[in-house]
């Protein structure tokens, strides 16, 4: 069995509403701090325009008042990676895989199962707020580390460094990482758009093939991406797609 870690997304699209889940004490402490911030404060914290900050202020107030609607996390997040993850018309095995083997790393909720009920919000590890005098990364580090220590199974990271940096350096080394590149006339290139789309397509392929070992991941091909043994190591998997000359 393998576990997969994926990041949150700024873009959200409400889906079917589900019953709420009581916030953890750690999330409650963050909520308390976020609810204290004015619209201007949020504009600075998020580096967004005042009108956007007003929307976020309303969201935090709704969560604080217990009035915010709840949605399955993997269905609510709708960034580029999520749009390339198969989320509809899932077989029983595929839904079981998403439910038990895919976890989302959140700076508000901690590490949560894919279908965990969450509210619309904007929050990541770049958010300029301190909780109990700690940065968000330091605040969550012990709980993130505990996830790796308790699991006793291989964990594959589809995270950016923003999220991986939350783990202690010694435990971070335990993560298996996956990188995606394009071969353009013999030159290997990567950028965020390639990576985000490929992460979603990769996870979909893993789910459809029901991969349960790291070796099984190396046998995958998807969206014209193939495993490159020459670029990879024991803990780093590289997949490359050849782009035809135009």
UniProtKB/Swiss-Prot annotation:
One of its GO terms (biological process) is response to hydroperoxide. One of its GO terms (cellular component) is cytosol. It comes from the Bacteria. InterPro entries: YaaA. Belongs to the UPF0246 family. HAMAP family: UPF0246. PANTHER family: PEROXIDE STRESS RESISTANCE PROTEIN YAAA, PEROXIDE STRESS RESPONSE PROTEIN YAAA. This is UPF0246 protein stu1967.
